[in-house]
Amino acid sequence: MPERARFVTHTGETVTAFALGRLEAVYYPGAVTRGADNVDYKFINGFVDVGELPCRTAVRAEIADRTVALKDDFEIVSTNLPGFNRRLEFSGFWHRPTRLSRWVRTRFVPPEGGDYSFRLATCGGVHVFVDGNKIAAFEPYTRNEAQETEIVLPLAADGSDLVMLVEEIAERDTNYFVELTWLGEGPLAAEVPGNADGKTLEMLMALARAIRPARIVFGEGEDLRLVVDQPATAAVTIEAKVHQSVHMRHLPPLFEAASTLAVGEKEAVFALPGELPDGYHELDIAFSLGESRINRTIAFALLRDDGPHRLAGDLAARKREGLSWLAEHGELRAGRVLARLALGLDLDDGDRAALEDTLDAIDTRRDCSDFVIVPLLWIYADHREALPPSLRKRIEAAILGYRYWMDEPGNDTMWFWSENHVLCFHVAELIAGGLFAEDVFANSGMSGREHAALAEKRLARWFDAVEDHGLAEWNSAAYYPIDFIGLLALQRFAGETLKTRAETVLDRLFSMIALHTINGVSAGSMGRAYDKELRAGPLSELAPFATIAFGTGWLNRGVAALPMFCAGDYVPPEGLDQFVAPPEGRAVSAHYVQGYGRAAQLALYKTAGVQLSASIDATPGAKGHQQHLVDVQAAGHPMARVWINHPGADDPWGSDRPSYWAGNGVMPRVTQHQNCCLFLSDLGENPRLAFTHAYAPLSVFDDHIAGEDFLVLRSAESFVALKATGPIEAVGEGPGAGIEHRVRGKRSGWAILVGALGGRSLAELAALAEGTNLSLSDDPLNLSCEGPLTPALRLDYRDGLFVEGRHAPFPTTSQTPEIAWLTAFAVPASN
């Protein structure tokens, strides 16, 4: 008999060793109802309490009087072991209301027989069975907000079988997990049942914990190489799948392959097909040996271009080149069809597939279908004569049958509440109403003329908010392209008043893009960020906008809005090029405010070689979301990016909001003085993760020197210097190897400096960084920085920045960037 895998949990730790049944997912919409219009147009970064949707109401009715029987014979398809997460986590994104359920099991062996307490946390529902008997049920079903209770389990001295049914109702992004904390005294052993060998499972889990891409980015002709820390002790099969982008996840994977990690080897190799597009790709991995199987999801960047594109000609010529690129390489979505029709090309099979998928998204009201109905309306308005009559009729039916706002009948989980979705829904309603003014819209019972009039009023409120407060999703590489969907469509189809207002906001967006783009990479502090935009700036959907607008950058397959920019006649303001590429020896400095309640006070320092930006003050000590507060991008390599945050989740590859790298679990106090940013973190008494960390991928910088409390990096002739209030621990194994640098403690501080080496060596800079004094003081909490690289700076946790002892409040309340030109900072001569 194989040795059963046994994992020990100590008091206060969570149990994560479980055998997993299949994830069951069933469409579950609930009754059609009219929602209440509760949008107040005060957009914030974070989850909005939107009330209860029909699917959740239906779940509550279902569970009220049901009886859940033990299912003791479910098929075990995978294993979850300690290492990724303190939760048993199945979170994800479902575009339609979906009932989720999964059976899991383990065997508990306590210190001795008796009744033992556990803390049980979840968002959905959990039913707990011990030795065949139902012991507990906990069903809060609170959307994405964990609830907890204490349960008592009777455990036999020689072990008890524990089975749980874990359930949730998915409404787009869904926190679906169980966190089971051992409160008893002494060690609790969890034995994973099944025929899987214990030692084999432990080996597979060690591989799954450690596996990561061998490179920050893979280029032309390179294989995908995945590395681990310890060699395999037996030949392990590794299956890998590259998924479509998040909005196309319902389609088959882009790539599937298997490789073998041979005995004694630490690298698995996958040949990447030429048709796999460039992108930051999610990669599902399955490790298997005999009957043992472990699953893991990671990601990797693929960028075959060895440098940014340099587009010749004026804006019109660059737009034409952009349309040609997208017509050939664009993702199979409505935007690609628009690009091809704008060029006068006939529909091909890919276009028809894209339109079929677009219509399905609209008809079934998938979340984010508002992002594709707008380009579909553009296609219909400008190119309907190029469409076959049958397809034209289907498009007309989809437009007339759509749900354009939450107060119309529906039982979907479309997200109506964030800044970008509000805009897209209102724009879609305006254009659809104008195109079909005399028709009755089947879902609402209103005429197109009534819809258009209502949309005008709603859009006026949206513009009032954005004009008064700026953007909650400032500078976001993920969400500016979505804003462009709505704004560019308004610029093309709206009446004069809304067109003018749209152009004003477009001008602001392109001004901010110009400020925050360096060598073709869109970077900078962001109101909402995900790992994919942070780790792979040139692969974001925002990057090509800068390429077309300013002539240098990266083109990729993103078609959410770029075809609308290229097919339309909007022209960004003149004079922005000077901010895109400052002259040698000069630096551009900018300060401005964005977001409701001055949520973001933004500072920028940028030279031709390096860019530093930060969001000042924010809400220190509060729970974070997706705010990306401190950012550095060097011009020497498109992936030469550095930032600091407090991780918001356990798993370095997880997708929580905030995640391990995107956003902050606990918000810091941040300030910036010219080329120096200070980051002061107070995590409170019982932080889930008691450290802050820097993302700094050493391999994409030309050189680096690390000291006990500093790290300096060179990119071409520019530098990035990090200094910390405690030892900087370079992570050498697992997903953080070569990129992650931690400072432990509930309170910590960092200084980030950028500039030109000015002919000095990196060693000279390292000596100056070592001689810089960065210190924390309590009562009141503050961070002081003094040394040869900066004036005397102090960041008070309550009162903000002091320069040479004088209080330096943020200098403006304007949404329009206040810009100054400075002499670029260069490393001074060492004494």
Place the predicted regions along the sequence by residue.
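Ser/Thr/Asn(+Pro)-rich, low-complexity disordered segments
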Residues: E202-N420, L454-R458, T552-N831
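Aromatic-lined ligand-binding clefts that engage carbohydrates, nucleic acids, or primary amines
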Residues: P110, G114-V128, L162
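Short beta-strands within extracellular/lumenal beta-sheet-rich domains
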Residues: R96-F108
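Beta-strand-rich ligand-recognition modules
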Residues: V130-F177
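Extracellular polysaccharide-recognition and catalytic grooves
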Residues: D370-A381, P388-Q594, R598-A600
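Accessory carbohydrate-binding/adhesion or oligomerization-edge regions at the termini
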Residues: M1-G83, L165-L207
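Surface-exposed loop/turn motifs at beta-strand-loop junctions within extracellular Ig-like
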Residues: G124, V166-E168, F287-E291
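Surface-exposed loops/turns
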Residues: E112-G113, A156-D158, D278
